[in-house]
Amino acid sequence: SREGLRVLHERCRGVDWEKNTGHMAELRGLEEIGEMGEVYRRANELHLEAEALDDRYGAVVAALHIATSGVAVDRSAEARERLRIALERWSREGFLLQHLYAVRAEIYADLYDGRPDEAWRRVCVAWPEIERAFFLRTPITRIDSRLMRARAALALAADGGKEAETLLRACESEAALLAKER
């Protein structure tokens, strides 16, 4: 809650991870209710604060939210640039949560920019990594992964290429799996 975050900021020291986690949850909640302009505004504030504190984790988390919300507020080029800078500062070992959400933001930028073929290519490249990192075992990352896969498949199928039927089946499969989520 905003009150909990206020207490962490005003009264606690050495709790950067906890503050970042709280901000991440707050921004995700705003994303889920479609308040993307507010996500964009707050994430930019958090990014400036994290940079001033030399807080790499906070800066990367904020940049991921800027990228996702940036697409929704007609700033896909900025979203891609923020992702590039954030990932330059992040570990290249493994496929971490930050990598998943960077791929998600890039896929949504591709879809926004009318490049469903590129979005689907990204899904196909990332999917084995998503599976290996066990992101399909945790509800929120499983739902996010399946949604981005379904959206990319549907967008490319709408282009009507030779793969349209296969892509629609992939989309239907993801939709059926998503329908089982609670």
Residue ranges and their predicted role:
Residues 1-10:
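Acidic, Ser/Thr-rich, low-complexity intrinsically disordered regions in fungal proteins
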Residues 2-3, 27-182:
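Helix-coil-helix junctions within alpha-helical repeat/solenoid scaffolds
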Residues 13-14, 162:
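Short coil/turn and helix-start
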Residues 15-24, 145:
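Aromatic-lined, polymer-binding surfaces characteristic
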